[in-house]
Curated annotation (Swiss-Prot):
Alphabetical list of NCBIfam families matching this protein: L3_bact
Keyword set includes Ribonucleoprotein: yes
Highest classification ranks of the organism: Eukaryota, Sar, Stramenopiles, Ochrophyta, Bacillariophyta
The species this protein was found in: Trieres chinensis (Marine centric diatom)
Keyword tags: Chloroplast, Plastid, Ribonucleoprotein, Ribosomal protein, RNA-binding, rRNA-binding
Location of this chain's protein in the cell: Plastid, Chloroplast
Protein name as it appears in the record: Large ribosomal subunit protein uL3c
First-listed, main subcellular location of the protein, grouped into a coarse class: plastid
Protein role: One of the primary rRNA binding proteins, it binds directly near the 3'-end of the 23S rRNA, where it nucleates assembly of the 50S subunit.
Gene from which the chain derives: rpl3
Length: 207
């Protein structure tokens, strides 16, 4: 796995390409991220790089978090995330990584928390078909049967039922990079990414 990046979703808009076609795009504020720890197979049992993102004040962190960063002489950072890599010797603590490691035309995977939509029924949450609306039917949006009888005498795990929709970590794959702005640390990608504007997102180069 390659080293990823952290950033925030700014929002969606649309741009025109050279042929005049409209392309829906999402604008992401990515990095700069700081490498806070380098883990090796020899010392830690596996190879990984930990990066930090988002400057905050000292009082925003717990003492263990603050001590972890101060040990490497790194300013307080709001988010820490670890990425498995094959070549940790190529990185060093304090190194800054940003959008300049990406290029136009590349494909990336973006992970974030989807927008929460609250308690939702089966039609909205699982795309169930509703019952008849007329002719005396009282089964409009009811779930119907949720299992068998005395045997097994329980509702089987994983049964699709009403409940909270959204607010889960999800990934959108193979998003094409339309534009990279290294000066402003802005990434413009084709399509949508999970979550609302301001949400934290993780960016990986697609396999």
């Amino acid at each position: 796995m390659s080293l990823g990046l952290l950033g925030n979703k700014i929002g969606m808009t649309q741009i025109f390409d050279e042929s005049g076609n409209i392309i829906p795009v999402t604008i992401l504020k990515v990095g700069p991220c700081v490498i806070t720890q380098v883990k090796t197979d020899l010392n830690d049992g596996y190879n990984a790089i930990q990066i930090g993102y988002g400057t905050v004040s000292n009082k925003s962190l717990t003492q263990p978090e603050l001590g972890h960063l101060q040990k490497s002489n790194i300013q307080p950072l709001k988010y820490l995330k670890e990425f498995r890599v094959n070549n940790p010797e190529e990185f060093k603590v304090g190194q800054v990584v940003n959008v300049e490691s990406l290029s136009t035309g590349q494909f990336i995977d973006v992970t974030g928390k989807s927008s929460g939509k609250g308690f939702s029924g089966l039609q909205k949450r699982h795309n169930f078909t509703r019952g008849p609306m007329t002719h005396g039917s009282k089964n409009h949006r009811a779930p119907g049967s949720i299992g068998m009888g005395t045997t097994p005498g329980r509702v089987l795990p994983g049964k699709k039922m009403a409940g909270q929709l959204g607010n889960k970590v999800t990934k959108t794959k193979k998003l094409k990079i339309i534009q990279v702005n290294g000066n402003e640390n802005i990434l413009v990608v084709k399509g949508s990414v999970p979550g609302k504007p301001g949400n934290l997102v993780t960016i990986h180069v697609s396999n």
